[in-house]
Amino acid sequence: MKITKIEKKKRLYLLELDDSEKLYITEDTIVRFMLSKGMEITEQELSEIQDYAQFSYGKNLALYHLSFKQRTAKEVKDFLTQHDIQPEIISQVLDNLKKDNWINDRKYAHSFIQSNLLTGDKGAFVLKQKLSQKGISSTIIEEELSQFDFTELTNKVAEKLLKKYQEKLPSKALQDKILQSLINKGFSYSQAKTAYQHLEIEEDQENQQELLYKELDKQYRKYSKKYDGYDLKQRLTQALARKGYDFSDIASALREYL
């Protein structure tokens, strides 16, 4: 069979044969097979051209996706799947890109963790979850995480949390809030506890007293409509204790308030 036309169509080329067959191919395919108008090709050669054209198109799509930022093998695979590239072609493309180091899950994990230590606020547990969602194996994740020390980051995040909540919460509630926030961000309990112990917390008794009475006003408005006497006092004590206030401070405030 003979090639009757090779015409550029945006990023692809339209190849027509004298038996009316048409197919879209990449520029790489033209170069690889040295295709030109009037060239005779066999059925076997046509099959090879079609296979390579699909591979080349898939690879070009993947490289386009990778041109914006580093990505994992799973992310590239998902992108190619969305563009209807056949599974066997995707496998070939991924193998080729891994060989040329365009895709490197270990390098991705290392950069991801390093970037978080420099500008992020997440601990190892959250990072492990995020990297796992991106298709990186648990072995690679664990090995890369073991190369980093999260102490400095834990301390930095704890200090930010202290600044955010110190004047808004009583001492006990402040401790609970900082510890829980650190754990939610992926730090271990021991890391969170150590970071909290390193904080320089200045007790502002006047502010603590102000917070207590403000909360007492709020709880009194809530419970005084239904309770009085001993029941009201008990309700207020329980409510304030749940908010993290010390029982002796609560008792003292209630003596003045009621």
Swiss-Prot record:
Keyword entries, A-Z: Cytoplasm
Name this polypeptide is given: Regulatory protein RecX
Family of this protein: Belongs to the RecX family.
GO biological process: one example: regulation of DNA repair
Primary location class: cytoplasm
Gene Ontology CC terms: cytoplasm
Subcellular location: Cytoplasm
Xref: PANTHER family: REGULATORY PROTEIN RECX FAMILY PROTEIN
Function: Modulates RecA activity.
UniProt source species: Streptococcus sanguinis (strain SK36)
Chain's gene name: recX
